[in-house]
Amino acid sequence: MKRQAFSASRRGVRFNPWEPRNPLDELTYVARLGAFFVMVQKLQTDKKLALVGLSYIISPEFFQAMNLAIIGTGYVGLTTGTCFAEVGHNVICVDNDREKVEKLKNGYMPIYEPELEDMILSNVSAGKLSFTTDLAAAVHECEIIFIAVPTPPHADGSVDLSYIEAVSHEIADALRPEHGYRIIVDKSTVPVSTGSKVSEVIRRYAACDVKVDVVSNPEFLREGSAVKDLMNPDRIVIGANSQRAMDLMKRVYQPFSAPIVEVDLSSAELIKHAANSFLALKISYINAVAAVCEKAGADVELVAQGIGMDKRISRHFLNAGLGYGGSCFPKDVKGFINIADQLGTPMYLLKEVEQINARQIERFLDRIREKMWVLRNKRIAVWGIAFKQNTDDVRESVAVKLIRRLAEEGAIVTAYDPKAAETGARALEGVSVTICSDMYECVRDAEVLVVATEWRQFATANLVKVRELMHLPIIFDGRNILHGENAVHAGFEYHSVGRRSLYPDR
């Protein structure tokens, strides 16, 4: 009769077959226990993230580190690889940009993401995370290869899969039967059936007798909170058409305390597009409601609170403002529309979501014009360049689009962003705008202040000081982050989205 060992799990104590362990595993376990207490000290204010570490220590089976390759070091690849290393895996991040790889090796971060830099430096120092341009070597060493390369949109909204195809071909060239079984994982956001095409490329170009499965494992990280999202996910979606691949992928995610959604390859590919499109729909819906509120004299924030308390709806993403932007939502909505069109099932609903989003910035500009009449030579300060707070990413940023439009109409524009000054300068090259290094200097002599990104420091700004620096006391809050009564008390006219305008006593 086999001896039994017990272990803790979210379902309580359960018994597992006892098997002899390598004594070195005990050392690994003790090291992880020590690392956990260090993590708790670092993250005293983040109980959820600490609980991830706890579940990692008392997981149902003793953790075995795996060798993982991440192809691509953008937001998704770099953050995913770093978090895998943080929980104990051995990770090689691969990129064909030699300069970028050298910078990463030397501790230079190509992106801003809270907590990421410290995590990268500590795992590189510990030997758990490395960077290389040698894809073949990574494929030789690693059991599982994640593809996290860009999937930019074409003009018609379809997804450009040329990077996926090229990387798949390179992986196929590097695979050898003697390396053993390998799993290739699509981590990039891809259209349904991409996994099948990757499999075809592998079969076409790989050596005979190579054993490979292709898996879809979409990411759901949010820029600005990507580390927390990856360390404490709502769910982990794994799409595989083989049980062997599914079992190994579950081992990869063993340290994470989250439900695993086990589905087929095509369903996993569709989940990401469907999820992001639904979130974009919620944003456009509340912005459409905001337009009604402005005409009816209602407050969209109160309306959102009232409907968001319904558990079937939730308050998340019911934030009226300038609309959605960034590298995901615009691309994924267009991609899903294109996928549906190609399959002969047009998504008219999502086309309206796009139109509402495009109209939102026009509605906002109309209100500024209504107040200021002609914008030429008007001094307008813009707080925010990044597409959202806690990131330096300006891809598809509504703030960037707004700055461009104001400059095109002849306004004298100054702009400030705490993290996106450099990326913003590149995105706004050729645009007549002055990017400032201080949020208060940005508003000096301005006739209008526009809040375009929801940075916390804007919400807590000293409005009395801002009023003293500005030429005229007019605020257009495109993110509804300022307290209107405080703005009025400081002497401002306050205009927001989906709420009535407020004026100081005259």
Predicted regions, residues:
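Intrinsically disordered, low-complexity segments enriched in serine/proline and basic residues
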Residues: 7-9, 21, 32
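Polybasic, lysine-rich low-complexity intrinsically disordered segments
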Residues: 2, 22, 42-48
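Compositionally biased, low-complexity segments
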Residues: 3-5, 51, 55
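Structural/interface elements that position substrates and couple domains in central-metabolism enzymes
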Residues: 56-506
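Low-complexity, intrinsically disordered segments with a bias for serine/threonine
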Residues: 11-13, 41, 59, 63
